[in-house]
Amino acid sequence: MGLTFWKVFLILNCLAGQVNGVQVTIPDSFVNVTVGSDVTLICTYATTVASLNKLSIQWTFFHKEASQPVSIYYSEGGQATAIGKFKDRIVGSNTSGNASITISHMQPEDSGIYICDVNNPTDFFGKNQGTISVSVLVKPSKPFCSIQGIAETGHPISLTCLSVLGTPSPVYYWYKLEGRNIVPVKENFNPATGILFIGNLTTFEQGYYQCTAINILGNSSCEIDLTTPYPGIGIIVGAFVGTLIGVIIIISVVWFVRRKVKAKGKERKRNSKTTTELEPMTKINQRTEGETMPREDAIQLEATLPSSTHETEPNATLGPDHEPIPEPEPALQPTVEPPSGPELVPMSELEIQLEPEPAPQQEPEPLIVDEPFCDEEKVIKP
């Protein structure tokens, strides 16, 4: 009932020619602006109150992803202030009856609803708000082309195309490149989403494809190659080959090191064996040099004594069939100094016979002993 009363009251005032309240006018409710450029949002007002000292102008911004409007500009009594992210970017009009603002350097995130609100106390009736929808136009960014599925013959695949930026939303078109010709692809294609369904890939469908994203500001394109295997296969093959090469290198290094260690071990063993073989020979030589003279050599030495000894003492040497005549100790026991060197070790006759003698000393024993005794017998038996 009350609402009907107010409606009737406003109608009567209009018919009477009496206009009370603030009237806000928005000439353009939809505004498009290119990214990076400036835009002027026009908002005018009319009031029945002559005094403008308490007049206030407020602009708010409502983004499609926000939950409530945000104040970006406020002016009262001729004092204006820009607020939030629009600070230093908004300039308001100083003309009476004009509440317009100019925003510089518009960005894609500035797209949304702008609300102009004018209030003048005591003038409470009328339309004091107006709205403007602003769209910041952006050329489509370079789209991203991709393959869904395995790009091999007989496998179902689809091609996708998407531009991250673009206002208004771009429309997508697919083309197949055949040499210098560009052939539009129309079947199984959605221009709004940019998805091209190919199905089971055949040799006829292999080739180069191009996707173009278009809006009122321009277009951008991307290309995709269906003539080579899917990149994932190449990555797997590359990883396998790299791993195989790494294993071969490791095996080669281990084999080389083991071979080198083995060679050093053989050389060390060979040197040790040579040293071991030389030690007994050295001991034998030292022992041979330090041994006493054999009995045969002593007999030969007696046989080669000077003749004066035989003449003066004929009984000193006897034949093999006679008893030996004792000789004076000074004449029969010449002192022979042992050679300087290691201590002589006496050895039994059996040990002397078993040890090998040098080649020059191997003479027949009868010849060395009998010949001198035969000659003595001739001398002794006249």
Swiss-Prot record:
Q: Which spans does this entry mark as compositional bias, Basic and acidic residues?
A: 286-298
Q: Where is the composition biased (Pro residues)?
A: 327-341
Q: Enumerate the transmembrane spans.
A: 235-255
One GO biological process from the UniProt record?
maintenance of gastrointestinal epithelium
Q: Where is the Ig-like V-type domain?
A: 22-133
The record's Pfam families line, in alphabetical order, gives: Ig_3, V-set
Extracellular topological domain residue ranges: 22-234
Residues annotated as glycosylated: N32, N200, N219
Record keywords, A-Z: Disulfide bond, Glycoprotein, Immunoglobulin domain, Membrane, Repeat, Signal, Transmembrane, Transmembrane helix
**UniProt-annotated stretches for the region Disordered:** 266-382
Residue numbers on the Cytoplasmic membrane side: 256-382
GO cellular component annotations, sorted alphabetically? basolateral plasma membrane
Where does the secretion signal sit in this chain?
1-21
Do you know which InterPro entries this protein is assigned to? Ig-like_dom, Ig-like_dom_sf, Ig-like_fold, Ig_sub, Ig_sub2, Ig_V-set, VSIG1
Q: Which PROSITE patterns match?
A: IG_LIKE (PS50835)
On whether Repeat is a keyword of this UniProt record, the answer is yes
Q: Where found, per UniProt?
A: Membrane
- PANTHER family, per the entry: V-SET AND IMMUNOGLOBULIN DOMAIN-CONTAINING PROTEIN 1
Name of the protein: V-set and immunoglobulin domain-containing protein 1
The uppermost taxa in this organism's lineage are: Eukaryota, Metazoa, Chordata, Craniata, Vertebrata
